[in-house]
UniProtKB/Swiss-Prot annotation:
Name of the molecule in the record: Probable exopolygalacturonase X
Start and stop residues of the PbH1 repeats: 231-252, 254-274, 285-306, 327-348, 362-394
Function in brief: Specific in hydrolyzing the terminal glycosidic bond of polygalacturonic acid and oligogalacturonates.
UniProt keyword list: Cell wall biogenesis/degradation, Disulfide bond, Glycoprotein, Glycosidase, Hydrolase, Repeat, Secreted, Signal
Source species of the chain: Aspergillus fumigatus (strain ATCC MYA-4609 / CBS 101355 / FGSC A1100 / Af293)
EC number: 3.2.1.67
Amino acid sequence: MKFSYSFVQVVTLLLSLSPSVEGFTRSRNDACKPNHPFRPLPPSQPRTKTCHVVSNGHGKDDSKNIMKALHKCNNGGKVVFDANKVYTVGTALDMTFLKHIDLEVLGKIQFTNDTDYWQANSFKHGFQNATTFFQLGGEDVNVYGGGTLDGNGQVWYDLYAEDALILRPILFGVIGLKGGTIGPLKLRYSPQWYQLVANSSDVIFDGIDISGYSSSKNEAKNTDGWDTYRSDNIVIQNSVINNGDDCVSFKPNSTNILVQNLHCNGSHGISVGSLGQYKGEVDIVQNVLVYNISMYNASDGARIKVWPGVSSAMSEDLQGGGGLGSVKNVTYNQMYIENVDWAIEVTQCYGQKNLTLCNEYPSNLTISDIHFKNFRGTTSGKRDPNVGTIVCSSPNVCSDIYAENIDVKSPKGTDNFVCTNVDKSLLDVNCA
């Protein structure tokens, strides 16, 4: 049984992200291996015409040229961003009208660093102050080619250090897409999350290479690899992620999600949530399979994070608590960890440091039918002697949480778990 990438596997995966369309298939189901989507993905129709986007060069805005090519080749065509060319985007692009179209990105698309413009004009999505440079949506849309999208993030990292309330755009916004393939692509220096998948279904992300760190003392914060939100039947696979926040995060109303074959470094793990942030709103995450993950230098491996039933503040720009909903039928299977603080973390006290208050006002979200299987590796030692924590705010809101074949130890050889308000007989771990 394989738990992690070998060196050869990592090299092969990196090579698959080179500027080519090799591996792209219009039969999306054939691309999903070894596990298949929860529901068959619709095939993509052939394309019969090609449009090349003209680059103005010299940092001039190419947005009009991009939109012209998209309209011209919509409904059955392919739009090409040519190799060895840089396309500058200084205008928010609404591309939710797309239908039966491919975008082949061979060159580089770079977004301007005009922070005043983007704060005023980026697309606002409501949840957690999310904004995007563009909205890509419609029906049967494929984006591939191995080229680069560059968010010019450094100016945003420095600005956020001065003002935590600024609106930082997400690099890649998939909004309202019904049927699509994204990748291979390289994503670099996103101001905030790298990808938001909202109100979308039947989309596969395959061969995404994510990387981008700050060159100043100000960290690149909140740089999640993917955030799924109000989306169904999404596949994320065969990708390399070097970032500073969640490798993948399943935000509210994410259902039927498959994540497999990822190499995550420097992240906060693969996370359910956070959920329950908005009082009175119902958040559901259901039917999720996370399979064959390598997790390095992270705060968490597998993580479920839920806000308590009382108002809390994680940071100046992230506050909430009191929401409703459920987490159900989530499986993490085959995860290798190295230098990770918590191999497994389940918390219903996200954003609240006062544990007494958290227990007095337990979470309104239920967590049930959760499976952690076949973990191995070594933690960072930060939580010694503990390697994992499975803590519910009340025994009434957690049920059927299982852990089996967990072979994880701290650098000192300990393997303790914190287990609170859960059925310990279902946990094949050392509940200290």
